[in-house]
Amino acid sequence: KSDNTRSFNFVYSVEVESTNNKKLELWIPIPQTSEVQTISNFSIDSDGLNYTVEDEQKFGNKYLYINHPRGTNVSKVVKISFDVLRKEHSNVNYTGVDSNVYLSSTSMIPVGGVFNEIVKENNLSKNDMNGVYEYVLNGMHYGKPKSVDNIYYKDPWLTSDGEYGMKKVSRDEVVSLYKYAKSTKGNYTFGNGNSMYACDIGVGNCTDYHSYFISLSRTLSAPARFHMGFPIPKGEEGKVKGYHCWADYFVEGEGWYPVDISEADKAPEKADYFFGNVCKDRVEMMVGRDFKLKGYGDQYVNLFIYPLMEVSDVKSDAFVKSFSYKNI
């Protein structure tokens, strides 16, 4: 095995509470083989629940759709397990990818408007994508506000006198925005991949960094894609706490160049590396944004990595998700 590949088994598990025999629906992303990862030994254990594997048409993803009209009166555990051979990679020519699909705006990734102004003011150009990368890297701060007395305040996260984002907000304003969005279930907050939020407020996670980058890229007429998956820790086996995402942009004749801007912000010594390269410690589950899923009604799904669940057509979070890996 070469140094630039990694092999591991991944288990995606969802424990669903009893629905008191009301209709249960569950949607879970399914990974696919590509030029940079090989998925094998894929298995689904639905614990007796009816399921189909569906194609997401626009971006070519797959997902598991559980539709069990009788629901369940006991808890059920749905598991998908698969082996991954993942490559470290730089630019890649992917077959069957239409770059034109990745030029227009989505609900949380607008194109043009304020992004045109940013491009003009900062002389950004599609001939210098490193400039776009650096602009986002310098403008964003990695972190998640929770509350004023949270650990992030004891452990320097944002400085108390700093100004963040184009709106030059204070740390306390960042936190109150977060609390407000939580109480109103709004999406102008951390972790929704909202480019406007990223640009205005300048504090977020991987979804925010990469959405911001994609808005700027597409505004420059450089196709760019959003990739969502899981980071795989360095050890032999263990839990995976949550998702990770990254992006890539297209150069005619050269293919798609990956970027991982939030990882570069967390590890500044790797900033040069993560412009044009991504490491092997990951698995991709979905590409794109604003997914139409079978049975999910008319609304688009902005981000799809964790389970979506409905009981009698009403959104529910009566489940426990867990993810684990083991090196092969």
Where would I find each of the regions flagged by the language model?
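Cysteine-centered nucleophilic/redox motifs
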Residues: 26, 80, 132, 166, ...
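A short, structured loop/turn motif at beta-sheet edges
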Residues: 19-21, 71-76, 121-127, 218-221, ...
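Extracytoplasmic/periplasmic, Sec-exported soluble proteins
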Residues: 18, 72, 121-128, 198-209, ...
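Intrinsically disordered, low-complexity N-terminal segments that are enriched in acidic
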Residues: 1-90
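Low-complexity, Gly/Ser/Thr/Pro-rich intrinsically disordered linker/tail segments
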Residues: 274-328
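Acidic low-complexity segments
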Residues: 77-193, 200
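Hydrophobic/aromatic-rich core segments of domains that either
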Residues: 208-298
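Solvent-exposed loop/turn segments at secondary-structure junctions
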Residues: 32, 85-87, 142, 231-234, ...
